[in-house]
Amino acid sequence: MSVGIREFSSAQELLRFIDAHLTELRKTLGDLLRVIEELRAKSELDKRIRELLLRLSRQGGEGTSSGSRPEIVKLGESLELVINPSPSVELRYLEDLAETINKKIAKLQAARKGVEQLAEIGLEAKLDVILVDDVPTTIFIKF
């Protein structure tokens, strides 16, 4: 998480900052959703192949092992290392990422509405803005 204070010369400048981040996040989300769709198809195919192999191994008598279970290793409190993820495991992580990006977009849109109110009154004052993950959380107006 990035946290900081940034100075903006006006509400208009802050709006441009928010709009730039919204544009970037929407592009990232669009790219990610395309990857997720591809992974969904791979995951479904992987699931059908595993079901077929399971059925065949029961009929043939000799067991087969897929050998592709992902190993998840915790590297500290907030970092995981996933070794050899199946498409469904990778899909789960990427869907979580897409949800996080979507929530950030919603927060930025809400912040933008608030800043628009400042811009509408023609406020021409310096703004010190507390940003948490590039989302404005507090604005100090300085005359």
Model-inferred region functions:
Residues 28-72:
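Extended alpha-helical coiled-coil "stalk/arm" regions
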